Each structure stands twice: as C-alpha cells, then as structure tokens.
Amino acid sequence: AVCQKSAAVVKDYDTSEVLNRKIAEYALAVVKDKPSFHISFIMNVSPNCDCWNHNDAAIVPDLGIAASFDPVALDCACADLVKAAPSLVGNAISDKDSVQTCTCGHHHHKGEDKFRLVHPDTNWEAGVEYGEKIGLGTRSYELVKI
C-alpha cells in the first residue's frame, strides 16, 4: 500500500483476500472484549484508498452517516448503500460498461458493485466474510433511516 505510516503493506505475494482477512483480524484484536461503537461517513467515496496522496472524483453522491456496535454489519450496510446509489459523472467508473446516463446528471450503475468496477481484482467481501467467521460481527443488519 502507499500508506505514509506503513500501517498497511501489501506484499507482492498477498492477494486482496489475504489483505482483507488480515484487516478483519487486526480489527478484532482492537475491539475484542472491549465496548466499541463504529461510525462511517459515506461521503466523498473515492475510487482509491484515502491514504493515497492523489485520487479521483467521488464515485457516488454523499450518502450520509451510518453507525453500529457491529463493525461487520456496518461495513456491509455501507457497501450496500454505495451499490444501490447512482454513480456520479466524471470519475473512474463513468466510462464503465452498462452505464446509463439520465437527465439528472448521474450515471446509473445502481445495484452494481462499484468497488469492483474500479478494482476488478479486489475482493472486499472476503474481509466481511472472514470478519463474521472469526466473531468480529455479523453480515446481517437492519438499516434504520433517521
């Protein structure tokens, strides 16, 4: 990775599945047997990691803030919200297949995995699947809009 603090390093032999599982293990080590509450700001969703010194325009409109005591459920809910949202124009996924532009100024990749549209070889789901398996949380959630 390009993290300036070298907190996340991907070895050449690591796959995205391995990296995402490691992230779940590290998260479990931090929260195990401790009270925790998690908040995600689903805003300025960029196509690349926030730690990069450069990035592209947001891929979806700002979707709001989500919170949960369960980090796995929170990640799943946030990913599902991004998948359900229309994609914005002028970014890394604007020219991808199956795009439909409408008069509202959005491209519609609704329901598509926008993270895979940007990075087809990345399997982000491996992290939440493994997180559930090791007891970090559950992929089931109830979305309550306020």
Where are the regions a protein language model picked out?
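Extended, low-polarity segments enriched in aliphatic/aromatic residues
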Residues: 1-146
